[in-house]
């Protein structure tokens, strides 16, 4: 048995790749997991539901505001210090063989605590541009797994640690009850802008079937009036629908792009440009460069442009599915280092 401590939460973009890694590790060896979740965030809820066998510890911590000299960061830095002491106590008790981190502020806390205790650290960065936690933790990590080759440019000092794997995707045996549809997503909390845009598109494309994850019951009711739209407040598991989709329309979070590329679904990406350090725009442009997507900037998005782009991606057809889940590559690398 190996004991793994893990953190990477606050958003689905950090959480789901981490769960994919842990679930793949568990298929290869007997694993006991200590999971550090952010109190009140998605990881706390999802991990307790999907993995009751994990020991889940909720930590009350919030990330630093931008710019970093923001006056509220003094209080947040104090809370990070308190949280680090709490995490150290749990790590000393659990005695993990390694720590797996996928970014976000909770990763910074757990990673620095693990570094002080001499626990091997493995990091994964989902985005093209690494976040602050990954930049800091890369110097202490045994391996730094990245989704894109271009991420090397942002971590030049740690080239010998970097392994380009792609972004892990959670596997599922489930199948969507529909097929040959355009999948519309706005992230785990939905997207008002995408919902409003698609409400104007649907009447113009009545021969095309859509499955739309709305993020709210109000929007689900509102979009259900269109006979060519299956509106769902939340889709779980996502993989069941990606398997059957012929195209997609979404924001450009790393997990969404990872699933799009893994299942070979061409997409239209409308990046959320207020995301930290322009992560989504950089992710979208890289997916477009690799031939998986058409990028439409939000200030340029119109129903006509979306309709024209849907026609292009549907005609392009599905791309060959990846032969190996990046989660599998990562689990092999980790086990090769510690076994």
Curated annotation (Swiss-Prot):
Catalytic activity reported: di-trans,octa-cis-undecaprenyl diphospho-N-acetyl-alpha-D-muramoyl-L-alanyl-D-glutamyl-meso-2,6-diaminopimeloyl-D-alanyl-D-alanine + UDP-N-acetyl-alpha-D-glucosamine = di-trans,octa-cis-undecaprenyl diphospho-[N-acetyl-alpha-D-glucosaminyl-(1->4)]-N-acetyl-alpha-D-muramoyl-L-alanyl-D-glutamyl-meso-2,6-diaminopimeloyl-D-alanyl-D-alanine + UDP + H(+)
Compartment list: Cell inner membrane
Enzyme Commission identifier(s): 2.4.1.227
Amino acids binding UDP-N-acetyl-alpha-D-glucosamine: 11-13, 127, 170, 188, 235, 280
GO biological process terms on file: carbohydrate metabolic process; cell division; cell wall organization; lipid glycosylation; peptidoglycan biosynthetic process; regulation of cell shape
SUPFAM superfamilies for the chain: UDP-Glycosyltransferase/glycogen phosphorylase (SSF53756)
Principal location listed in the UniProt entry: membrane
An annotated Gene Ontology molecular function: undecaprenyldiphospho-muramoylpentapeptide beta-N-acetylglucosaminyltransferase activity
Gene Ontology CC terms, in alphabetical order: plasma membrane
Record key words, sorted: Cell cycle, Cell division, Cell inner membrane, Cell membrane, Cell shape, Cell wall biogenesis/degradation, Glycosyltransferase, Membrane, Peptidoglycan synthesis, Transferase
Topology relative to the membrane: Peripheral membrane protein
Listed pathway(s): Cell wall biogenesis; peptidoglycan biosynthesis
Function, in words: Cell wall formation. Catalyzes the transfer of a GlcNAc subunit on undecaprenyl-pyrophosphoryl-MurNAc-pentapeptide (lipid intermediate I) to form undecaprenyl-pyrophosphoryl-MurNAc-(pentapeptide)GlcNAc (lipid intermediate II).
Family note: Belongs to the glycosyltransferase 28 family. MurG subfamily.
The name this protein goes by in its record: UDP-N-acetylglucosamine--N-acetylmuramyl-(pentapeptide) pyrophosphoryl-undecaprenol N-acetylglucosamine transferase
Source species of the chain: Thermotoga maritima (strain ATCC 43589 / DSM 3109 / JCM 10099 / NBRC 100826 / MSB8)
């Amino acid at each position: 048995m190996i004991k793994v401590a893990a953190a990477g939460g606050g958003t689905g973009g950090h959480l789901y790749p981490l769960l994919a890694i842990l679930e793949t590790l568990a298929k290869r060896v007997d694993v006991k997991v200590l999971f550090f979740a952010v109190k009140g965030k998605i990881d706390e809820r999802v991990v307790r539901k999907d993995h009751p066998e994990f020991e889940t510890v909720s930590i009350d911590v919030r990330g630093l505001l931008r710019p970093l000299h923001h006056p509220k960061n003094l209080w947040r830095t104090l809370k990070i210090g308190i949280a680090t002491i709490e995490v150290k106590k749990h790590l000393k008790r659990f005695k993990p063989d390694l720590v797996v981190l996928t970014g976000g502020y909770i990763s910074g806390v757990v990673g620095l605590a693990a570094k002080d205790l001499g626990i091997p650290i493995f990091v994964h960065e989902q985005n093209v541009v690494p976040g602050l936690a990954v930049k800091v933790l890369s110097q202490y990590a045994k391996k730094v797994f990245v989704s894109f080759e271009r991420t090397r440019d942002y971590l030049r000092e740690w080239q010998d640690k970097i392994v380009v794997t792609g972004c892990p995707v959670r596997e599922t045996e489930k199948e969507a009850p529909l097929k040959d549809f355009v999948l519309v997503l706005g992230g785990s909390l939905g997207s008002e802008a995408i919902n409003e845009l698609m409400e104007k598109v649907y009447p113009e494309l009545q021969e095309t079937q859509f499955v739309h994850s709305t993020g709210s019951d109000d929007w689900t009711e509102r979009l259900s009036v269109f006979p060519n739209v299956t509106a769902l407040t939340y889709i779980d598991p996502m993989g069941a629908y990606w398997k059957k989709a012929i195209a997609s329309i979404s924001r450009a979070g790393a997990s969404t792009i990872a699933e799009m590329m893994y299942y070979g679904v061409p997409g239209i990406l409308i990046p959320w440009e207020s995301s930290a350090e322009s992560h989504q725009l950089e992710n979208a442009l890289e997916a477009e460069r690799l031939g998986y997507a058409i990028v439409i900037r939000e200030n340029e998005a119109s129903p006509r442009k979306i309709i024209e782009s849907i026609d292009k991606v549907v005609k392009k057809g599905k791309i060959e599915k990846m032969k190996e889940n990046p989660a599998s590559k990562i689990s092999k690398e980790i086990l090769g280092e510690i076994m």
